[in-house]
Amino acid sequence: MSTSSRCLVRGSVNIDEFFHLPHIVRPGETISSTGLTKRAGGKGANQAFAVARAGGQVELDGAIGDDGIWVKEMLESAGVGTDKLKIVKDEVTGRAVIQSAADGENSIVLHAGANYYLPSPTPITSLATYTHLLVQNEVPLSSTLAYLTAAGQSSPPLTSVFNPSPMLTPAQLREFPWKHLSWLIVNEGELGDLLLAFGSSANPGEAKEDELQAKASAGILELHENDYFSKNVGIICTLGAKGILYYEPGKEVGYLPAAKLQNPVKDTTGAGDCFAGYFVAGLMRGKSLQDALKTCLVACGICVENEGAMESVPTLDAVKERLA
């Protein structure tokens, strides 16, 4: 890891509350839960946590309420810098209230809470001390765009990584400042959303299992050539248990299979955020793209063998041990 490499994550912090139920509550019904689990979450917090677990110097820029102090402490215990994590009075930390049924079905209610705290105008302190920026789409888009633009206009520009989850609207995608982006991380469904927004009829997210890799690969190349997109952006497309596709401008689309698991899958919730965090940390270390991605895949393999979003993210030592 370069001693001068530092990542800023601008993103969300949530408290995820899981109500364990015999079935999803029907309209007008009142039932008792069989258990309540409370976990730290939010894509910004999860990804910052993963960068730190992967050995990267990282700071989280976001907001919580007084009820989220324990999440702040959890992030700090992993090595995440929290000087830019604002505590908003008279506001709750972002919430995900999840009904988790015995048959595996779930129902989710989201409340943005402090994540949508946005001073006017958005204050962006100098990004000169950072080399990398990681953003998602769980805070106001205007803030995300401001940070990306500032990163792109810095001298030298920051390496910026965008994981558009939840997905932007078609109009927002067409107006997005792609020229300020270095890397885009999407899954096959999100890749299809982008192509449709840009006027293509291709949709890799609807491909049959045996056609997924070929159609997603073709979709990546089509996206790269689209006039709405920037030809300088690298693309990573995750395919779940099938592995990943990756594209560096000027090169061919590459493929890597998912890592072999040593234990049964317990929870895939945190896999995407684990991947994003480990990917940025790999870039910060100056590793080759293939080596960085192989490390990401092993980290995700360990992640899905455990429960929770943050709790399941492995340390770099654990990943190295499995790679050995």
List PLM regions with ranges.
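Short beta-strand scaffold segments in enzyme catalytic cores
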Residues: F49, R95-Q99, S107-I108, G243-Y247
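Conserved phosphate-binding/catalytic loop of the ribokinase/pfkB sugar-kinase fold
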Residues: L60, K84-V88, A96-L141
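Structural detector of well-ordered beta-strand residues that form the stable sheet scaffold
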Residues: L8, E59, L134, T159-V161, ...
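Substrate-binding N-lobe of the ribokinase-like
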Residues: R6-C7, P27-R95, A102, R322-A324
